[in-house]
Amino acid sequence: MRIMMNKKNIKRNVEKIIAQWDERTRKNKENFDFGELTLSTGLPGIILMLAELKNKDNSKIYQKKIDNYIEYIVSKLSTYGLLTGSLYSGAAGIALSILHLREDDEKYKNLLDSLNRYIEYFVREKIEGFNLENITPPDYDVIEGLSGILSYLLLINDEQYDDLKILIINFLSNLTKENNGLISLYIKSENQMSQSESEMYPLGCLNMGLAHGLAGVGCILAYAHIKGYSNEASLSALQKIIFIYEKFELERKKQFLWKDGLVADELKKEKVIREASFIRDAWCYGGPGISLLYLYGGLALDNDYFVDKAEKILESAMQRKLGIDSYMICHGYSGLIEICSLFKRLLNTKKFDSYMEEFNVNSEQILEEYGDESGTGFLEGISGCILVLSKFEYSINFTYWRQALLLFDDFLKGGKRK
């Protein structure tokens, strides 16, 4: 009975989202809104949601909406072009959202081929023009940078892009080397992503989060290794990254906490000097995201200590849930639940079952509390929350939406090239 209620509740919210997007695309037919084309806030996330929720009752309706939204995206791309190849704001995000359709229709295959060619152009241009002195998170991170693009590219089983994957892996690996006495990933104050972060880190910092920092780079290097794309330098970089977390874990007994950013004098003295002003237990920053680094790193390097610690990090974070005051994926409860689900799938652990069950039981309340002000986006809006809830009601996955979150269901399967 509860399952039927959950499905009805999800369906009601999806219909509301469709109505909002139908109206929005109608009004903006002759205008350009960059956000509409992004995985973060736009139609790619809606396409993923609809594809996952298709069943015998609504398959034709949802597929028609998917086709309409893809046509809308193509019309905008034809007129305005692409601004970036990134996962959350550009070509990689659009490509990921339609990748599951590549065998269904020749037009989708052609669109993917076009997007992939642009991604290759974008990556090569970015790396060729890169200046280490001006490095900023969008150069390398998951959201806007090459780590996110690589996560998408590793889904493509096409030798044509093997060199491109290795090019990104080498680029990311080199960023763990020293530059002027600091790791190359150290970001100057003026190169932070926002004015508030520049003010927070007047001396610059090494970002320790998953979304914009060191953990995200480590996760994608570990996954690339499992997929058969690695070398001595990338494995050394992965080890170096994890050792940084080992060295700078806050000295609070069995808390498994890290600061969001490390400052130059801390890195040089190899110890935490400044007190953390704020700690969040989320996908984007904090223990949950870092637990993925330890999990993937441990599996890739065959290190049981790292794998065991990954589970402890996540367990501690789930008990605290610091700074978690919403249901979004990025820095809310949905993101935590998806990480818990991954640990269950990869490690066959039951330690997080109670959190997942509680989330499922409260699904109706969760969707009711998720107001219109939260938006419909994938990363911070209700469509992402619905995707997380949907896995409790629909057992088959049709798309690759978890890949965008560095949640690699196939990590144990590998997929190395023969």
From Swiss-Prot:
CDD domains: LanC. GO terms for biological process: peptide modification. InterPro entries: LanC (IPR033889), LANC-like (IPR007822), Nisin_biosynthesis_NisC (IPR020468). SUPFAM superfamilies: LanC-like. Could be implicated in the processing or the export process of the nisin lantibiotic. To B.subtilis SpaC and S.epidermidis EpiC. This is Nisin biosynthesis protein NisC. The lineage of its organism: Bacteria, Bacillati, Bacillota, Bacilli, Lactobacillales. The gene is nisC.
